[in-house]
Amino acid sequence: AAAGNQNDPVDQTLSKENYEEILKSMYQAVKEAKKGVVSVSAASKEEDWDAEATGITSSVSGVITADNGQELLIFASESVCKDAEEWQVEFVDGTSYKASVKSRDKNSGFAVFSVAKNELSDATWNAIHVAELGNSNLAAQGDGVIALGNTLGYEDGVSYGIISSTEYQQKFRDGECGVIGTDISGSDGATG
């Protein structure tokens, strides 16, 4: 047979180099997406010795979901609301700013926090952006996903996986919503 015959099967083996290029490409998406991910914690005047020793904090991951002109709105777990009166949000550049709770839903376990835009430094403003949210109705089993934030119980985690299910419905006292399941492992208290 002549070289390059159209009937020859195409070698679809994924080489180590191909795999590394895929991971590098995915990490470029991670670096951009991280600009919209924050850490929300209860403000404390006491030092958190446990967090300093272990790297594990009592913060939750959040997503910058909107800019209403006056403040940035951040969607996160409401678990940091318990017994707290003040909150802080740490942005991707490592700076922290005072936050307030705009809305809290104990049934779903989520809250919306806000940070005044006029408090942000120019450096922070240039380092962040409002997350681009997709359409969950278009998510399909087998689609690739990336989880960011407190995915494994510590801050600044990155995990890759696929959507394993789009059929699950979570029931709450006041309704239900669809849940997109992934094969990304988590840990107790993870909020990425």
Segments predicted by a language model, with ranges:
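N-terminal targeting leaders that route proteins to membranes or the secretory/organellar pathways
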Residues: 1-49, 56, 86, 120-121
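A conserved glycine-rich beta-strand in the N-terminal activation segment of trypsin-fold
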Residues: 18-28, 44-76, 96-98, 130-132, ...
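Active-site substrate-binding loop(s) of clan PA
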Residues: 28, 64, 100-102, 120-154
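Short conserved beta-strand and strand-loop elements enriched in small hydrophobics
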Residues: 40, 85-93, 143-150
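Short, conserved beta-turn/loop elements at beta-strand boundaries and strand-helix junctions
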Residues: 45, 57, 67-69, 82-83, ...
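Catalytic-histidine neighborhood of serine endopeptidases
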Residues: 67-109, 117-118
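Active-site region of chymotrypsin-like
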Residues: 117-131, 159-192
